[in-house]
Every structure is written in C-alpha cells, then in structure tokens.
Amino acid sequence: MLEDLIKEFKEIFKYDGEVETFFSPGRVNLIGEHTDYNGGFVFPCALDFGTYAVVKKREDKVFRMYSKNFKNLGTIEFNLDNLVYNKKDNWANYPKGVVKTFLDENYKIDSGFDVLFYGNIPNGAGLSSSASIEVLTAVILKDLFKLDVDMVEMVKMCQVAENKFIGVNSGIMDQFAVGMGKKDHAILLDCNTLKFEYVPVKLKNMSIVIANTNKKRGLADSKYNERRSSCEEAVKVLNDNGINIKYLGELTVAEFDKVKHFITDEEQLKRATHAVSENERAKVAVEFLKKDDIAEFGRLMNQSHISLRDDYEVTGVELDSLVEAAWEEEGTVGSRMTGAGFGGCTVSIVENDHVENFIKNVGKKYKEKTGLRATFYIANIGDGARRYVK
C-alpha cells in the first residue's frame, strides 16, 4: 500500500526524488467516557489502522496538501505567512492548525511541505481521525525541521490546535492515545495531571470488536460542548457552596453523594453524576483487568453505557440498538458506546468462538431496527504516531 501512496504522491506533485513516510493511529477508548475534560481517568488504546502520510519538504513557504479520502477537494494550498482557519480548506484546517500552534509556541518552521494523506479510519466514526491527522502533522514537523520537542508536548499542542483553531472543546484523551499508544497496551491516563500508566491488555481467547453505526454526525456541531458546560456549571455550584474543586474528577462517588444536594438543576445533576461515577468505574475496571478478570471489566463497560445513556444522554437510538443487540449475544463479555456519542462506534469484548455470529446477528438486528448497515472491525492494539519505516 505504501508503494502505491508514494507513486500517487509523485504523480500529484510531479516529483521524482526521495520522500518521507509517516503513520499515526486511530484510537478507541475502552472505558472512561466524557471524563477527560472533567479531570478524570480514561483508558484508551491506539489501533493498528490510522492515517498515512507521504511528505516532501519544500524550499518556499507553501504547503500543498492532498487527501485520498477527499479527492473531490483536490490539492489544498496555503502559505506559512497566512495560517488562518478557512472553511473551504475543509479537512486541511486540522494540519494547518497544528502548524500554526507550533509557530505560536516559537518552534522554528521556516518552509512548507507537500503531503499526501490517506486514512483508513472511517470519518465521523468517533475513532479520532481528527486527532490522528493532528498528531501525524506534529510528528512530520518534528522530523522535517529537527525540532527538540517530546511527544507529550506535541500532544498538548495538538489539543490546543483543535480547541482554538478548529473550535472544538475536546479533552486531551484522543491526541494522547494517538501519540503515546503502545502495542498490546491501553493507557490509564489521569487527564488532570497527565500522569499515565501502560496496562497490558491480555484478552487471551477474546477480541475487541468495534462496530460503526454509520450514522452521520459532526463533533463540532454535536451537543458535546453543551455537556461540557453542564459539568462546568455543576463545579461552579459546588464551589459556591464551599466545595473547593477544579474538576468533578476530583471527587469519589462517596464524596459526591454527600454534596450533590447543592446541585438543584436536574440536568446538571445527571451530567455530574455520570462524570463522577464513570471516573470511578474506569479506575476499578483497570484494577480488574490487571487481575485478568475480564468478566468484571466487561460488566463495568455495560454499566458505563447505561450511565452514558441515562445520565449523560449522549447515546441515541443507533448506539443503543448496537449495544443492546450485543448484550443479547452469547459470548459478549461487555459492550458500550465509545467516543463522544450521538452516533459513532461501540466497543465490545467478545469471545473468539462467537465473533462471527456476533457480527452477523448484531448487524442484522441493527439493520432491522434502524435501517442502517453497521460496519465491524476486529481491533488490534498498535503503537503511537511515528515516522514510518517499512
């Protein structure tokens, strides 16, 4: 595949010399959903599919970007001296925002580059195609311009690019998982301190199955930002009543139960209840995983989905239909929505002997209920973003 991408790069950019190649994964979060911007714990892993780039540094200040995923948009061109968000640049605003953020942080980037991107992460699936291209761009910049910057710093800058340049208030989880991923491990990340731990994911006779609802959705215009402000309002209410916290993630369920009566707005209370309980669930689930108790880990995945459905209200009929069909299947250890919600994907742990039936039966029930056709992927846990050497 890489040879084909290099060949296509050379045709599009009329160039026949040496090129650089890079890869950046997608990610899936196993548990700990909508906790990242609440200063809590998440448990994502990088996937073995993602975004590839073929790159050639230029002598001038021009960037020319082409994506095989958006061929109809052709080559998108912009200049180092004019890095502003432009709606018609569409997907290229993501890499552009990363370049701008590096410059704002005083990293020396003195020329542009030509790049061909190709991603095999389904767009809008909630598997972080945007974080993947952001971190990929950061790795390209570091390599081409020999920048002295570590991955955690790059991850933070990519989050800034998404928040400030694109205008989506995402937490740090996506970029962190994409940049810091490690084969066969998930990352227990404290989003408040960025302390993290690699935890081996040893599923023995089971697999991680990702199911895509194939429902069209956009993160920026979804109700994501509303959920976030609900939680911030709840924190404000608690602070006004003498509970001194910056994030809901600082409270255990027991501590929250003692003070939740201060939150009189019913919707805020539900949102805060999810943030606190999900954070505790994530920590407990990882302890079970370390003890090889996959059954308990799966049970907590199920509870996570119920909380996201009832308290956080970010699931919707498509995700619920997929998860409920999964729960009915023999061999399902756990199943929940993953990512921001309102469409996107579910993640399930399924016994290998039952995977084939799982895909067939869940797909059939989902189509009967929603009229949509789900796409299924068996996920392998891969490494983070890097220069790609065959």
Describe the function of each predicted region.
Residues M1-F22, V28-G32, G40-F41, N79-L80, ...:
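Gly/Ser-rich oxyanion-binding loop with an adjacent helix/lid
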Residues M1-R27, Y52-K88, H185-G334, I349-K390:
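C-terminal nucleotide
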Residues G32-H34, A46-L47:
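N-terminal cofactor/phosphate-binding cores enriched in small/glycine residues
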Residues G39-A46, R227-R228:
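Short Gly/aromatic-enriched secondary-structure transition segments
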Residues A131-S132, C345-I349:
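FabD-like malonyl-/acyl-CoA
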Residues F342:
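Glycine-rich phosphate-binding loop
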